[in-house]
Amino acid sequence: MNYDYLIVGAGFFGATVAERLAATGKKILIIDRRPHLAGNAYSYTDQETGIEIHQYGSHIFHTESDEVWNYITRFTKFNDYVHTVPTHHEGKLYPMPINLDTINLLYGKNFTAEEAKVFIAEEIKKDIEKYQIEEPKNFEEKGITLIGEKLYQAFIKNYTEKQWGTSAKNLSAEILKRIPVRFDHDNRYFASAKHQGIPKAGYTKIVENMLNSNNIEVRLNTSFKDVESEIEGIKVIYTGPVDELLNYELGVLPYRSLRFEAEWTNDDLGHAVINEADKDISYTRTHDYKYYQIHQPKVLTSKKSYLCKEYPADYEVGKEAYYPVNNADSEALYQKYLNLLQERYPNIILGGRLGAYRYWDMDVAIKNALDLASSILKK
């Protein structure tokens, strides 16, 4: 096949661009260095229990975009799962994001919504005066000004420090735009999502369906370097890290990584995910994937569970880069790489979470891919 485009990376971004271009007759080669499709959303079914295992941690599809929902539902059917995430703190489970129940449980009160609003506002005012915060200088001060010290210390501080691998005082206040606090009993994690659910056939099947075209060739276990000699003169959409593509010539862009420890057990988490807010527990989340399969009662009531603990990890070259560490220095370095890329590879378009150096949810990746494909086809 003579290709019109090479797409590097078969996650949702790459697969969406491939599907859209192929639908107009373009010939596409899409590659991925992993042995599977779907990127970090990759899932597979355990044959004994029927549990759909999310290889790289829980993925819950949610979006406010009708465009994205109408597109993705061409390739799968979703169940009606609505995500809730209790947070474990000092032996108790609290609803998260923070709501009226969280506040009452933590403070041992029985506030009404209006009473809680007044109380939290007073707590914030008192703590701002206590720490003499005029303008928050770091993440910790910003957190205190948003929700008060007690809520911040209980649910935000330690979780954040585990996630980022540093003191909250070393993190920029700019990272923390807002902390949602609901003065009602709504415990939905994605309360603003117009659409959400779990694909009934798993995430990998979505991407398989997207790439099921005579105009698309898929090669797994294949890196960009493996095919570079074959694709001279054609356009490339590259969804990997730009620093790796350019051999780290300007230095390594900062990322965070993850590691997972999983085991089959007869124990039961009781929830799809529980967050761990306390410092003495080094992992941030535990996953019990069977709780996503509300459309399969037999799986949901299985006596076995595949419990997976998620540990944040420092990133180094050779590890998987899961999400970028965005700050002024990293943004400046990324921009330098973009300039160098334009000089070396003017035929390459960057995209996807790693290529764009952005922390994107699945729906945002798909939306950006739809926009890119549309702009390409208009030329």
Feature locations, PLM:
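N-terminal Rossmann-like FAD-binding beta1-loop-alpha1 element of flavoenzymes
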Residues: 3-30, 373
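Short, solvent-exposed loop/turn segments at secondary-structure junctions
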Residues: 12-14, 35-37, 49, 101, ...
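Mid-domain catalytic core of redox enzymes
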Residues: 222-340
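C-terminal catalytic lobe of FAD-dependent flavoproteins
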Residues: 320-379
